[in-house]
């Protein structure tokens, strides 16, 4: 009788693992893998750790009044700098963490919360 119980326990233990829940504040105050703000800070030569969060750029510099070349564009969870304008009218944005990489591409500014000169 004991042998089947031991075998069953051994079998079941092969398919279980320790589940460890993360503390609900594990990434308190920022998104876990967001690095666009940190990249832009380095790219523009502004070594300020508070600029690691994209939204912090909405208070940096002064209001540009709208998009333009050299303007930092801020979305709720992303930030980049405008480097040009495509023939179709879209602004060309240079940013980090755009699809997990540093990219320069035409992009809509819809949903932007700030345009800043820094």
Please report, for each region that a protein language model flagged, where it lies by residue.
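Sec-dependent signal peptide recognition
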Residues: 2-8
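...with weaker cross-activation on analogous glycine-rich loops/strands in unrelated enzymes
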Residues: 48-101
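N-terminal capping segments
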Residues: 9-61, 94
